[in-house]
């Protein structure tokens, strides 16, 4: 029998972090052993839905002095995410990251650290398996249509627009098509920005409001027909099968893997 994979969560007190801890506690072959969060005001956190408590520290370096996991799951944002990932790599701890806001330069730095140390990292903008499949299919469909719109909507607390997943979908579409899409440019735009952002001819639209978690919709257009692909995440639990899949995969990785599609064997597309 394979040993249990021990997991800690960075951002453990956040909504996603709390959900990851609960998922890890329920996942066969995985054991949560700690959490880190800058808002930590105690030395432990009780995992929601269980009677289990794990050590909690304000920083990963402090947590590693108490409990050093096999894998850290990180859903923090931007600069904090990069520093957390590099801290884990330097400590020999593998990382599954769902953080958005990492620049190409950040990703290259992470790639170099991972390759040099042999410590695996999985970075993905979306861990919902359906979103990964949508991205893969959108890349295929792009070969056969000249026009496309991409619409995404999220909860009102999301800090970036468009979403990292939307950008990954758009990149997969251009990769699949091999060229820019055709685009209708309005002669008269009475409300500036109505046509959305322009990504290689794809009109990209973002909505933010309460009551939503995540929705991505791709609409392709051709003479006399449209093709619509939609993925909805109704709650944060929708991401957990993908996160746990990443946890079990990254323990065997020795470099940076970008996109859950590459874990699933669906090619280069990268949510």
Predicted regions, residues:
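Short glycine-rich anion-binding loops that position phosphate/pyrophosphate groups of nucleotides
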Residues: 78-79, 101-102, 126-127, 209
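Structural motif
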Residues: 10, 75-76, 98-99, 124, ...
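C-terminal substrate-binding/catalytic lobe of Rossmann-fold NAD(P)-dependent oxidoreductases
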Residues: 3-66, 146-271
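Rossmann-fold NAD(P) dinucleotide-binding segment
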Residues: 64-71, 75, 79-97, 109
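Rossmann-fold NAD(P)-binding glycine/threonine-rich loop
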Residues: 83-86, 90-91, 99-121, 137-139
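Rossmann-like NAD(P)H-binding beta-loop-alpha module
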Residues: 133-145, 161
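Glycine/charged-rich beta-loop-alpha catalytic/anionic-binding loops adjacent to active sites
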Residues: 69, 94, 115-122, 222-229
